[in-house]
Swiss-Prot record:
Calcium-binding protein. This is 20 kDa calcium-binding protein. The keyword Calcium applies. InterPro entries: CALM/Myosin/TropC-like, EF-hand-dom_pair, EF_Hand_1_Ca_BS, EF_hand_dom. PROSITE patterns: EF_HAND_1, EF_HAND_2. GO terms for molecular function: calcium ion binding. Ca(2+) 2 binds at residues 99, 101, 105, 110.
Length: 154
């Protein structure tokens, strides 16, 4: 059965894989794993998550601060990672479309056009500030990492 988190759905086969990994780390068969096992569990899923992100997610699903999470909490964390990875793929696809010269960078004027089209009613000054914060070297171009940080507010 698929599992839905906000607007993201974890497919049935992904839930099964997650369940298998969860069981491996549920050493006592208590239907819970230690929050310290999240990192190794994600590595077992061939996923990389920064330790501070794992801690943040663990804190969100370990409501009573026991240091343990159940399978539902694990699935929520897994879903967040899958969503994060999908968002990055989508941004890479968008970046490739905007990278007209296929040089791994987009012109800040193209970025300005994108920001105007986001529908956030940004002023020219706000857009200028965002571009200045993104194009830190003043080259007039933005690479994918800079684009990603801007679009995800990281």
């Amino acid at each position: 059965m698929a599992f839905k988190i906000d607007d993201f759905t974890i497919q049935e086969d992904q839930v099964k894989i997650a369940k298998d990994v969860f069981k491996r780390f549920d050493k006592r068969g208590q239907e819970k794993i230690s929050t310290t096992d999240l990192g190794p569990a994600f590595r077992a899923l061939n996923l990389t998550v920064k330790p501070d992100t794992l801690k943040e997610w663990a804190d969100q699903v370990d409501d009573d601060a026991t240091g343990f999470i159940d399978f539902n909490g694990f699935l929520i964390c897994y879903g967040k990672k899958l969503q994060e990875d999908q968002d990055e793929r989508d941004l890479r696809d968008a970046f490739r479309v905007l990278d007209k010269n296929k040089r791994g960078e987009i012109d800040v004027e193209d970025l300005r056009w994108i920001l105007k089209g986001l529908g956030d009613d940004l002023t020219e000054e706000e857009i200028d500030d965002m571009i200045r914060d993104t194009d830190t070297d003043g080259s007039g171009f933005v690479d994918f990492d800079e684009f990603y940080k801007l679009m995800t507010s990281e």
